[in-house]
């Protein structure tokens, strides 16, 4: 059964995903990410990472949230990726 993960994302990376230039995420492997899991990328301020832009807690606008699905999981400890990290392939939800 797939899970949904809310991930805070700095503007430079969020915007690159939004433009379609960045089709992956590098994350600490602390959530048991699996192929088919859903990601909600939340545009977050770099200077205050605990604050999600435009009040996510009370409903951020759609321009500050991107929904993606994990299409591939490359685990760390190989190919120069640190152990404890993953590279997640991102696709559009169906």
Language-model features, listed with the residues they occupy:
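Catalytic phosphate/metal-binding cores of nucleic-acid and nucleotide-processing enzymes, i.e., regions
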Residues: 2-94
């Amino acid at each position: 059964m797939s899970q949904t993960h809310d991930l805070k994302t700095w503007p430079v990376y969020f915007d690159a995903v939004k433009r379609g230039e960045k089709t992956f995420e590098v994350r600490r492997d602390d959530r048991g990410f699996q192929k088919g899991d859903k990601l909600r990328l939340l545009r977050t301020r770099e200077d205050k990472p605990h604050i999600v832009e435009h009040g996510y807690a009370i409903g951020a606008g759609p321009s500050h949230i991107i929904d993606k699905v994990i299409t591939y999981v490359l685990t760390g400890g190989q190919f120069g990726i640190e152990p404890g990290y993953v590279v997640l392939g991102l696709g559009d939800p169906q």
